[in-house]
Amino acid sequence: MLYQQSYPITNKLLNASAAGSTSTASIIDGGCTLSKPGSGKTKSTTSLPSFNELLTSIPLPNEFKPSTKNTNQAAAATATSPYNYYMGPPAQHRLPTPPPYPMSSPTTATAATPLSQQSPHLQPQQTLQQPQPYHQQYYNYQYAAPPYPHPSQVPPPASYQQRHQQPMYQNTNGVPIIIRPSPGLITPTSTTFDHAKIRSNSTGDLSANSLALSSNNNTQSKDPRRKHVCKVCSRSFTTSGHLARHNRIHTGERKHQCPWPTCEARFARQDNCNQHYKTHTNGKNKRNRQQHRTLEASHVGTKYNTKSLV
């Protein structure tokens, strides 16, 4: 900052006023002019010091050099001053708005068209005065989904036979055109087939009807000696004994009992009973076998004694 003293200037001004001067006194200090109006008539003229005399009479700490650097520094100081933000007028910021989309495009907005779409060439002043609401800016990016057909207009799904039938021929202007059915998705209605039929269509085997006929032919073409057939499972046997033994499986009858005295196991087949009896009379249980013999002998002796007594 520049420092200057104004004592000589004030003394000269006081002397001029005491003399009754009615002229205008102007003092230029850093671009500022002070004027003192007087009466219309001038009684006496008093010469005032010039601007150069005032500058030379004021003691300055440094030399005063009028240059553009001081003005540039002052302008920079005023520009970078932290008080300019509060002293200046409030700045109006314009938010960036998305570009308007044409209404003829397939991706049209679902919400009502805002002001930016109605007049795409808006001026900055208009956008500042009429900002778009938040919900309108948000819905500008909401695009409509492709329209789905009405449920009544949806064609019914093609059946299994229609999708696998032979290609159809259609004449258009005398020219034959081959139309092949497109392989559609398998719907639940087309999957209600027999597993045997689906397997026959996929692997080339016989159909369900042919399988049933072949099963009947196999039963008739079996060995003619198997005349005895089970009534429950239709299994055939060569002898009636085999059939009777097989019937015990269905009835649950266990006619054969283990001959061991303390064992009460029963079996439907005799060979199974004999195999079980060997568990009691094997080589590891010789003592048990001897006991069994003694028990049998005692049992036979008691029977003989009872007979003799009778």
From Swiss-Prot:
GO terms for molecular function: DNA-binding transcription factor activity; DNA-binding transcription factor activity, RNA polymerase II-specific; DNA-binding transcription repressor activity; double-stranded DNA binding; RNA polymerase II cis-regulatory region sequence-specific DNA binding; zinc ion binding. Disruption phenotype: Exhibits a high degree of filamentous growth and leads to avirulence in a mouse model. It is found in: Nucleus. InterPro entries: Znf_C2H2_sf, Znf_C2H2_type. Residues 85-131 are annotated as: Disordered. The keyword Repeat applies. GO terms for cellular component: chromatin; nucleus; transcription regulator complex. GO terms for biological process: cellular response to N-acetyl-D-glucosamine; cellular response to neutral pH; cellular response to starvation; chlamydospore formation; development of symbiont in host; filamentous growth; negative regulation of DNA-templated transcription; negative regulation of filamentous growth. Induction: Down-regulated during filament induction and in response to serum at 37 degrees Celsius. Expression of NRG1 is also repressed by RIM101 and under conditions that repress CDC28 expression. The bacterial signaling molecules indole and its derivate indole-3-acetonitrile (IAN) increase NRG1 expression. A zinc finger (C2H2-type) spans 228-250, 256-280. Residues 104-131 have a biased composition (Low complexity). SMART domains: ZnF_C2H2. Keywords: Metal-binding, Nucleus, Repeat, Repressor, Stress response, Virulence, Zinc, Zinc-finger. Transcriptional repressor that binds NRG1 response elements (NRE) of target promoters. Involved in regulation of chlamydospore formation, hyphal growth, virulence, and stress response. Plays a key role in regulating true hyphal growth, but does not regulate pseudohyphal growth in the same fashion. Directs transcriptional repression of a subset of filament-specific genes such as HWP1, HYR1, ALS8, HWP1, or ECE1; via the TUP1 pathway. Functions with UME6 in a negative feedback loop to control the level and duration of filament-specific gene expression in response to inducing conditions. This is Transcriptional regulator NRG1. It comes from Candida albicans (strain SC5314 / ATCC MYA-2876) (Yeast). The gene is NRG1.
